[in-house]
Structure formats: C-alpha cells, structure tokens
Amino acid sequence: MYQPPEASCWTGRVDSVSDERAFRLHQRIRLLDLSGPLTPLEQAAAFIGFVCDEGVRRNQGRQGAKEAPAAVKAALARLPWHLPSGASIYDAGDIVCADGRLEQSQAELGKAIARLLQSGVAPVVIGGGHETAYGHYLGVRAALGPNARLGIINIDAHFDLRPYDNGPTSGTMFRQILDEDKQVGYCCLGIQRLGNTAALFADAERYGCEYILEEQLTAGAIEAAYERIEQFASRHDSVILTICMDAISAAAAPGVSAPSPFGLSPSLARALIRRIVSHPKTISVDLCEVNPLVDEGGKTVALAAAFCMEALLHFRRLQPRR
C-alpha cells in the first residue's frame, strides 16, 4: 500500500530562513507524490520508505524495522544541508506492508523505484527489514530492462542466501534474485564467519558470489577493497548498493535485528559507502535492518541517517553536469 509523503515528519531547528548556508534538510526537502504523474528531473534523489518487517518475522528475527523509515527520516530532517547547488531531494512517501503481504509489498516497492529511475531520480530506499532489497532489485530491473548486467553490492554480515522453499524472508532475497536473473552479479562486503554456516559459504561459492570478510576489511586494507569494488563494477552496466546495518559493530549499531559483537566500524563503512555511491555506475541505494524499538539512545537511527546523507553527498548524479 502506498502512503504519500507528509510534511509533518520534516521538522527541526531553524538557524535562518534566508541564509541557505544555515539550512538543514527539513528546509530543503520537497514532497513527491507517486500517485500522480512524474516529470523528468535532473540532479534529483528521493527517499522512499519500506514500512515492513514481515521478512524479519518469517526469519525469526527481532521485529521493529517497520518503524525505521519514520525514525530515520526524522533524524535526516535535522542534518545540515551540504549538497551542491542545483541538487533536489524529495520524500516520495512509503510503501506499507499490511497484513503480512510481503510479496505484494515488494512488488509495489519495485514499481515505485522503477518510476523514480525512469524520471531521472536516484532512489534512496529506507527499510524495513532486508527483504527491502528484493523490492529494490525488482524496480531497478524493470527500469533497466532484462538484458542489462546488474551488479549488487551488499554491505552485510550475512550472505542472505537461505533457501526459500517455505516462502521469502529477510534472509532469502539474494538467492531469489540469483535464481531468477542470470544477468546479476553479487558482491558482499563485511561477511562474518560466525554469522553464516559452512553451508551458506558453500552456497556463496556455488552462486559465484564475491565477498570480503569483515576481519579482512581494515583501514590498512581499504585500498585493496576499493580495487575489488572497481573490478566488480567494471563487469556490470549498473550497480546498486544495499546496506544492512547489522554489518556494523553492535557497539555503534545496537538497534538491529541481529546485532554482532564484531562488525565494521562506522568510519570504515562510511568509506565504503562513499566509494561505491560515487561510482558512475551506481544508480540507487537501500539501507535496512534498523530497529528503533531496541535501539540505545537513538544511536543506530542517527548512524543510519548519516549513512543516507553520505549517499546523497557522494551520488555522482547529484553533482552538476560538466
């Protein structure tokens, strides 16, 4: 079910009403109702929420991620505006999963994302459980057509390649995608040995998944990771980034479905996000698995908002054309 955007969630401190250098995001955000016609836009990105944690429930995780789109948007509203002149940021509303209808909601999310991309708008999808990524994929594939080579980069502690014999969950979507679409490549950054069974590592090898373990992603090895990202992107026509917040150490991101005692530092994750999003082939981003109900002092929500803003600041398509 589609819910149009509401101005009421975009409020915050006002340091000036005339000096744009003092503006915050809530003073620059625009509302974009997807239930009406869309006109082509340039230098534009849009947040769209996926109010859903049905996949988390089916995966026996801690529910609460459906509260994240509203919480993350509220945190984003308070952040200062540093985007280039000419950039426009929109709130495109939310797709709400009602009565457990996960598959229908993922299809609706896909249609919304396809419309944004076809109008020249870069989607920044705020989940929701990581089942969000399947709807994200559906929209990108619809916009690109069936023959484009699509690379998916997943910053995550888990492969999310579980079998889906009993239906999709928040842990099955990349297996679904790879089974359905032979034009997709899959690369995972931050995989944890203790977060995946040996069977899942074997499945990752069988599906041709590229990955870098969390313990290999250190500040001293970041250039090697960048090179792997460049090589992966070079083999695809377009790239999408999906961020699962459980890839981050629980000390910095406790409010997730499956917190980890290990994990990436926020600064290292930020470096990866900047590198991936600034690549000219990257067309969209999603961020998932924030659970405000179990967060500590709002730190996970705040970090998620910061990651979303980093994506906006480094999107190539939001920069002025030269």
UniProtKB/Swiss-Prot annotation:
Needed cofactors:
Mn(2+)
- Organism's domain of life? Bacteria
Cofactor, free-text remark: Binds 2 manganese ions per subunit.
Q: Which UniProt keywords apply?
A: Histidine metabolism, Hydrolase, Manganese, Metal-binding
Q: Which residues bind Mn(2+) 1?
A: H130, D156, D160, C244
Task: Give the family from UniProt.
Answer: Belongs to the arginase family.
Protein name according to UniProt = Formimidoylglutamase
